[in-house]
A protein has these predicted regions:
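Ligand-binding "clamshell"
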Residues: 89-118, 205-207, 219-233
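A conserved helix-loop-strand patch within extracytoplasmic ligand-binding domains
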Residues: 101-161, 264-268
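An extracytoplasmic/periplasmic, membrane-proximal ligand-sensing/linker region
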Residues: 36, 169-184, 253-303
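Ligand-binding pocket segment of bilobal, Venus flytrap-like solute-binding proteins
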Residues: 156-230
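Short helix-initiation/N-cap motifs at beta->coil->alpha
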Residues: 35, 56-68, 187-201
Length: 303
């Protein structure tokens, strides 16, 4: 009889455990097809799991597919960039006067689609022009894009090369707009179009005078590249922040409080270091995320 009771109690506890596991709220996170998105999704997933959520991550998504999946309720949470939402999803071409204005605008526009922008991070993964280390030493006076343009004009006969990824070089709001804003006159002899990853290789090997980069890319520090100030404010702001479906936030309002301190921990330099651990040191995104959460303990919120 005692054995029967023990078995029944054991079965009851087991079923209770299954029930508790089944009761964990599910959050479906999406990530686009580049390192930073994978790292952010992994950090968020591990953090939410530690706070009682069941999390599934779908990675390798294109921008349009990821957005469509979230708008149609197939994904619950994405780390999004204000400039992407403004231009690509909401088709607003006018430049906002500040990062805060950009955030406020996309928060308003996306709310109409049932999407809520939570507290933004402290990093912006926007475009920039950078110099290789040797060029930076040879031209210490070049700290801004305007100063770069002065050198390119003064030394036009030397046909200095500028590396750009193919997409940026051919977009109307890319190279053409940059040249118009800064009064640049880069011809075919000056431009080298290539895959975005090869731009960093060309810069590292000092094969070009300057190149287009992303401000939170881990290779900036690893390759000792010098970022130039966008002194005429051409490049739009791409502040990152978690965007969640309103229906999910209404069901689990503690998510806003839970994700706020995570966003506070993420600035430009932190993201460069995290991205470098994957792209340069070849660590897995999951191990990078786990190490980050160990080094930056965040408070728990019971769902």
């Amino acid at each position: 009889m005692k054995k029967v009771i023990a078995l029944l109690l054991g079965a009851g506890l087991l079923l209770s455990g299954f029930a508790q596991a089944a009761e964990k709220p599910l959050i479906r996170i999406g990530a686009r097809v580049f390192t930073e998105q994978t790292v952010l999704a992994e950090i968020t997933a591990q953090y939410l799991r530690a706070n009682g959520f069941d999390v599934r991550v779908t990675g390798g998504l294109g921008s349009s597919l990821a957005r469509q999946a979230q708008e149609t309720g197939q994904l619950d949470l994405m780390w999004e960039y204000t400039g992407v939402s403004l231009v690509s999803y909401n088709h607003i071409d006018e430049r906002m006067p500040s990062p805060e204005a950009t955030y406020a605008k996309v928060k308003e526009l996306d709310a109409r689609k049932g999407l809520v922008w939570l507290k933004p991070s402290k990093f912006s993964n926007t475009y920039a022009l950078a110099l290789p280390s040797e060029i930076a030493r040879e031209y210490p006076q070049v700290n801004t894009i305007s100063q770069l343009n002065e050198v390119l004009k003064a030394e036009q006969s030397r046909k200095h090369l500028v590396a750009l990824d193919t997409e940026f070089a051919n977009r109307p709001d890319g190279l053409d707009g940059l040249q118009a804003r800064y009064g640049m006159h880069l011809g075919r002899a000056n431009i080298r179009q290539m895959d975005a990853g090869l731009v960093y290789t060309a810069l590292r090997n000092n094969q070009v005078f300057a190149g287009l980069v992303y401000t939170t890319d881990g290779r900036l520090n690893a390759f000792k590249l010098k970022l130039l100030e966008d002194d005429k404010h051409y490049f739009p702001d791409y502040t990152a922040g978690p965007v969640i479906r309103k229906a999910v936030l209404d069901a689990h309002p503690q998510l806003a409080e839970l994700l706020a301190p995570l966003a506070d921990q993420l600035d430009d330099e932190t993201m460069r270091q995290l991205n470098a651990k994957v792209d340069v040191q070849h660590q897995s995104p999951s191990s990078v995320a786990a190490a980050f959460l160990r080094e930056h303990p965040l408070h728990e919120v019971t769902p």
